[in-house]
C-alpha cells in the first residue's frame, strides 16, 4: 500500500514539476551521477568565467528522523496532497510510539512526533517534500546548490 501511495505522490510531484531541480536522489533520472555531472559543469563554468566558487558539503545526520510531522503535513498540503490522501498520511504518522530496551530495562512509551518510516516505500518521497523548501529558499537567494537524499536502509 505504501509503495502505491508513494508512486502516486511521486508522479504528482514530477508531473506538476513541484520539486526543485536542485534535488537529486529518489527522483527518476536524477541520481548521484546527475548530481556530480551538474556540479562539475557548474564548477567548470565558474573556472572558465573566472568567477568565485564556494563549496560546502553538509551531511544531515539522521535526516529522515528529523522530519517534524506537523511541518510535513503543511508541506504536503502546500504541494497539493489533500483530502483523503492527506488524512490517510496523517493517520499513518499519528499515534506511533516507541520504547527503548536496555538489557532488562524498558523506557516509558513515548509518541513519535518526528521521523518518516525508514525502509518504507513512502519515507523517501515524503523526505523530498519536506526538504524542498530548503532548495527553494537557496534558489530565491541566488545560491546554486545540489541536494542529494539517500537512505541506506531503503
For each feature predicted by the language model, list its residue ranges.
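Conserved pre-catalytic core of RNA-dependent polymerases
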Residues: 1-117
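Short, conserved phosphate/pyrophosphate- and ester-handling motifs at nucleotide-, phospho-/glycolipid
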Residues: 119, 123
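Active-site palm subdomain of RNA-directed nucleic acid polymerases
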Residues: 5-23, 48, 125-154
Amino acid at each position: 500500500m505504501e509503495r502505491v501511495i508513494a508512486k502516486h505522490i511521486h508522479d504528482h510531484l514530477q508531473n506538476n514539476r513541484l520539486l526543485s531541480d536542485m534535488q537529486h536522489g529518489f527522483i527518476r533520472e536524477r541520481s548521484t551521477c546527475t548530481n556530480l555531472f551538474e556540479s562539475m559543469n557548474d564548477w567548470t563554468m565558474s573556472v572558465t568565467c573566472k568567477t568565485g566558487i564556494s563549496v560546502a558539503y553538509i551531511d544531515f545526520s539522521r535526516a529522515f528522523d528529523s522530519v517534524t510531522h506537523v511541518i510535513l503535513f503543511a508541506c504536503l498540503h502546500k504541494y497539493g496532497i489533500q483530502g483523503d490522501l492527506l488524512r490517510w498520511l496523517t493517520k499513518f504518522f499519528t499515534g506511533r510510539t516507541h520504547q527503548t530496551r536496555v538489557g532488562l530495562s524498558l523506557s516509558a512509551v513515548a509518541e513519535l512526533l518526528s521521523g518518516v518510516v525508514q525502509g518504507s516505500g513512502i519515507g523517501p518521497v515524503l523526505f523530498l517534500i519536506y526538504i524542498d523548501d530548503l532548495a527553494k529558499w537557496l534558489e530565491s537567494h541566488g545560491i546554486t546548490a545540489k541536494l542529494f537524499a539517500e537512505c541506506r536502509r531503503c
